[in-house]
Amino acid sequence: MINHFDLKKVPPSIKEDFSEILKIINQCFSSHFKVKNNLFYELSFVSEKQSLQLNSSLRNKEYVADIISVCLWENAEIITPLLGEIFICSKKIAKDAIKYDVNFWYLLIRMIIHGLLHLLEFDHEQSDAYEYVTLTIQEQIVNKVIKTAKKKIWKNQELLSLLG
C-alpha cells in the first residue's frame, strides 16, 4: 500500500477534506498497481516563491510549478520503501483551475496522481509514447478516485460540486 508519511503546511481551508481525499488517492493508486508492500512518500505544500526556487535548483526551470516530484529511486542502486517527496503549490493549482475552467479539487487530485507517477519513474517528457502511457494511467486513477470519493459525504461545498 502506498501511504503518505508526512504532510507539511496544508492550507487550513482544505485540510479536513484533503486528508480524506489523500487516503482515497493512496488506496486507488495502490490498487491500480497492485502494491503489496508498504511504500511511503512525503507531501509538502509550498509557496509560489518556494516552487520557483525548487524548480530552478532541481530541474533548471525558471517558472512556478504546480507540482514537483523528487524521486529517490531514480538511478538508485538500492530500492527503499521511501519513494520520494512531492511539493505542491496550491496557489498555482488554484490559478490553473481558473485558467482552464476546471474545479480546484479535480486539478489537485490530478496533480498529486501525476506526482506519484513521477515517483514511480513514469516520465511523460521522454517521448510521445511515454506521455500517452503516463497520461492514460493518470486519467484511469483520477477516475477511480472521483468514483470512490462520490460515495463519501463532504462538508466542503466546492468538493461536493466536483463529486456531483
From Swiss-Prot:
Give Gene Ontology CC terms: cytoplasm
Xref: Pfam families? YbeY
Q: What Enzyme Commission number(s) apply to this enzyme?
A: 3.1.-.-
Q: Which InterPro entries match?
A: MetalPrtase_cat_dom_sf_prd (IPR023091), YbeY (IPR002036)
Keyword match Metal-binding: yes
**What does this protein's UniProt record list under function?**
Single strand-specific metallo-endoribonuclease involved in late-stage 70S ribosome quality control and in maturation of the 3' terminus of the 16S rRNA.
Output the HAMAP family linked to this UniProt entry. Answer: Endoribonucl_YbeY (MF_00009)
For this entry, the protein name equals Endoribonuclease YbeY
